[in-house]
């Protein structure tokens, strides 16, 4: 199983990071709008074992092309950065994938939008993320912690602490702390 290694950093403003990426000659990949549907068993067995099951649709803002994936994430490994085994496959339909998981007795426990701008720098993927209620994050994913740290330093983000909690955990905590029962989190209509 492939290993996902990443550093997630909370930032106030994405503009300085975007500017730094441009100045460093990073490759712009695209702007995307994602919908992430998170599934678990009725008794929350995946969550209890620090595992995840997600169906994601990602729409390219420019071309409107859409990709849908189903992803299983294994438990996080201990270390300075977030790393975990990940298996992902492309599927034809978000609706069909969610229906299939429901037929297999998985329950959708959360759905949230994310705006993502994707870049490549130093052999790493750099994602500039905006999430409703949670704010702005930079995710740097690479083949090794060393490669990620190098990109983090080159973006002047070395002083930012790494957030090891997944977006799912951050969003669930936000909703629970506020007594929110609606688990479908979207950006306000514009």
Q: What name fits each language-model region?
A:
Residues 145-146:
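An amphipathic alpha-helical core segment
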Residues 129-134:
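A contiguous pocket-lining binding segment that forms or flanks enzyme active sites
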Residues 1-125, 157-190:
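N-terminal strand-loop-strand beta-hairpin
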Residues 137:
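Extracellular structured ligand-interaction cores
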Residues 149-155:
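Internal alpha/beta scaffold segment
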């Amino acid at each position: 199983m492939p290993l996902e290694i990443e550093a997630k950093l909370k930032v106030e403003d994405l503009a300085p990071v975007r500017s730094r990426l441009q100045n460093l000659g990073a490759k712009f990949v695209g702007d995307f709008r994602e919908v992430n549907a998170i599934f678990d068993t009725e008794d929350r067995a995946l969550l209890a074992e620090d595992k995840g099951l997600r169906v994601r649709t990602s729409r390219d803002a420019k071309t409107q092309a859409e990709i849908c994936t189903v992803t299983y994430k294994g438990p996080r490994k201990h270390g300075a950065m977030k790393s975990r085994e990940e298996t992902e496959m492309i599927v034809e339909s978000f609706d069909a994938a969610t229906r299939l998981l429901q037929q297999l007795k998985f329950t959708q426990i959360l759905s949230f939008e994310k705006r993502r701008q994707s870049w490549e720098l130093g052999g790493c993927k750099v994602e500039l993320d905006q999430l409703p209620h949670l704010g702005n994050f930079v995710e740097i994913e690479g083949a090794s912690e060393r490669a990620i740290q190098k990109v983090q330093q080159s973006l002047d983000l070395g002083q930012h602490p790494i957030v090891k909690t997944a977006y799912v955990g951050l969003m669930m905590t936000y909703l629970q702390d506020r007594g929110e029962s609606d688990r479908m989190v979207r950006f306000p209509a514009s």
